[in-house]
Amino acid sequence: MHFISTRAHAELKRAILVFLFAAASTSTLLADQWALLVEPSFMDHKMRRPIEGSQRTVLAIARVVDGEIQPLTREEKKSVHMTYPMIQEQALQTASEVFKRMKPTFVRDKNQVIQYAAIESEDPLTASCVLAPEFAAAFEETLGPDLLVAMPTRNQVLVFSKQDNAHLRLAEKIINSYLTSNYPVSREIFTLESGNLRSLGILE
């Protein structure tokens, strides 16, 4: 019969506890993340941040818990000991994770020139992927360094070159997507400036 010494037993117990703690921490990280939702201003989100130049679209602060989006309430905010920059930093990491899962489709004209990129997904955070710090760089080779983005619905993003007016040619499509969606976001066109959204106006 083999016996384990008291010291070896203590070390084994300590190793198991460290492993369980690490596993629990990882589980919590994956299950509870911060997110910034690009949302229409008519939604009654209590904790929101403005988007420069926009009166119809906001960034709503939310948690993603076990895959479920839970907008932050004022009551919940009282128990969250984090500043907005701290929440934003984690939310941008969430946006990056979402963007990595996206597969943009490039739409070309009859001469095979890229007109715009379309991102569509069932992920409810699809529109928020534009906040990923690496978003603009991912399209620089195809659409140039200056981008325009439209997010007519929670599940759709259209990316254009700022040097073209392709977004105007698609205005009717963008508006129709917004009006017919169960989860509309915005009928505005935005620029991405240093990772921040700025509204250029509403498509008519």
Identify what each model region corresponds to:
Residues 2, 20-21:
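Short, charged low-complexity linear motifs
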Residues 3-16:
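Bacterial N-terminal signal peptides that target proteins for export
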Residues 25-26:
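N-terminal signal peptide c-region/cleavage motif recognized by signal peptidases
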